[in-house]
Amino acid sequence: LTIGFARRAATYKRAHLIFYDMEKLLEIGKGNIQIIFSGKAHPKDMSGKGIIRNIVQSAKKFDGKIKIIYLENYDMWLGRLITSGVDLWLNTPQRPNEASGTSGMKAALNGIPNFSILDGWWAEGCRDEQNGWAIGNHEALGDEKDALDLYSKLQSQIILGVRQKYL
């Protein structure tokens, strides 16, 4: 299962959420998933640049047990490749900060199911277990609860579905 996460590197987008509990991610992801990250930070956004560094450092800690890559030089061409070439689109913004979530829209237009916080367009577009999966509910739950729901659904619904040829 190839998971994609590509967009502007901004703190509210919480690219790091999937790494909240690295042991749990390894437990459910080893041999089951690979993750492709990409994005850019504004040149003056030190926090955004830090997010990219943290993703790269976190990926190294898995030592190949889960394949994780950060593709540099994100642009429209690379975004098109990623949003059409993954099996699942991950979107984990802090509610209620996502204005629209165009990367998830692009993935959906390419037939890629979304796995997302109910914010931006996904708050209205989500048909849980039909066109993707919701992480959490319509309330801002915080990193811990969102991460626990992410891991639970990834393991019990999404990966299991792939094994059963659901996706």
Language-model segment annotations:
Residues 15-17, 46-49, 79-81, 101-104, ...:
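A short acidic (Asp/Glu
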Residues 3-5, 35-37, 55, 68-71, ...:
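Generic structural hydrophobic/aromatic packing signal, biased to beta-strands
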Residues 26, 83-167:
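Catalytic binding pocket for nucleotide-activated donors in carbohydrate/polymer assembly enzymes
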Residues 1, 54-105:
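Donor nucleotide-activated moiety binding/catalytic core segment of transferases
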Residues 47, 51-54, 78, 146, ...:
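Alpha-helical structural motif
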Residues 1-74, 165:
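Conserved catalytic-core segment of nucleotide-activated headgroup transferases in glycan assembly
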